[in-house]
Amino acid sequence: MKHVFPTYKRFPIDLVNGTGTVVTDKNGKTYLDFTSGIAVCNLGHCPANVAEAVQQQLTNIWHTSNLYECALQDSVAELIADGKDRLVFFCNSGTEANEAALKLARKYTGKEKIITFEKSFHGRTFGSMSATAQAKIHQGFGGLVPGFTYVPYNDIEAFRAEIDEHTAAVMLEVIQGEGGVIPANAAFLLEVQLLCKKMGVLLIIDEVQTGLGRTGTLYGFEQIGLEPDIFTLAKGLGNGLPIGAMVGKANLSSAFGPGSHGSTFGGNKLALAAAKEILRTMKQAGFLEEVNAKADYFRYLLEVHLEALDNVSVIRGGGFLIGIELENTAEPVVTELRDKGLLILTAGANVLRILPPLTVSYAEIDQAIYLLKSVLENQLIGSEEG
């Protein structure tokens, strides 16, 4: 790719077709895609109902800007609000959604300090990069946006020592995806929420990777009983079309009036047509119950077949966001699996990250388990011989 900046270390395959969980490269080789485009294609590749909704919108109107009223925006926002007193700001990506959340928090509170957590990932624009507590993400870009403070994840005493009257907001993920697929302890999250309420600090939850059914509920925070002041969405909201959303309690609206923030393409009608059908699908009776049943089945098989292997340290995560921490580096496993027709990711040097579409079949889960076990066993034999 000689005309594209090398900002990604790309896998040496060019995927040109996809249906459901199966993708095909330009040479005709097929793969089971257990990456979902990094937790994006939650309904699988090219779901027919979403394609039909987008196709219908293509023949009507594509883009008008946010200078005009838009019934489609309002209907999608209502679906996102999910019966709660929430308002939505539409944008194009997760990092934009997080930028909007950070701006809203500072403007509403009039304070600057924002607490985030070590190994977090919130994006790569300057505000969201500054919120990301990973030195490797910051390297080479000079001074960060001031006002961000990082504390250890799952350490309530460290958090208690840091939150104060100068704090505008706390931003966190209920499962740190890029940071190694590390779940937060429920007790930790509930105590964070309690302290935020006590101190008048806004709680922001980054649901870019964990939201839209990925962890078994529409939003990951619902499983713990959290009520964030603000949360952010992207990835699965468009199933491959670029869309993000910052969702806040309605009482925050006074800080985000005309001219306070904006996005030229945010709320684009093509992306919204997809989002509306995706949300409608996920809210259908039995959909998330089936996702949870398949996720439980997958986790059970992972534990039965992989947990006892000497090169597997721990299996963690939630729903269809799974991390397998290895004793050795993860990249050789990912490479061998790709050669054998299974696509997965890493999350750090020694963690496999597995993100199948929510629509994956039981047979596809069985095949993935077979490949994972055979490759990990083969890697173990190779390391012993080496």
From Swiss-Prot:
UniProt key word Cytoplasm: yes
An annotated Gene Ontology molecular function: N2-acetyl-L-ornithine:2-oxoglutarate 5-aminotransferase activity
Cofactor: binding details: Binds 1 pyridoxal phosphate per subunit.
Gene Ontology cellular component list: cytoplasm
InterPro entries xref list: AcOrn/SuccOrn_fam, Aminotrans_3, Aminotrans_3_PPA_site, Class-III_PLP-dep_AT, PyrdxlP-dep_Trfase, PyrdxlP-dep_Trfase_major, PyrdxlP-dep_Trfase_small
Example GO biological process: L-arginine biosynthetic process
Pathways per UniProt: Amino-acid biosynthesis; L-arginine biosynthesis; N(2)-acetyl-L-ornithine from L-glutamate: step 4/4
PANTHER family per UniProt: ACETYLORNITHINE AMINOTRANSFERASE, MITOCHONDRIAL, AMINOTRANSFERASE CLASS III
Name of the protein: Acetylornithine aminotransferase
Encoding gene per record: argD
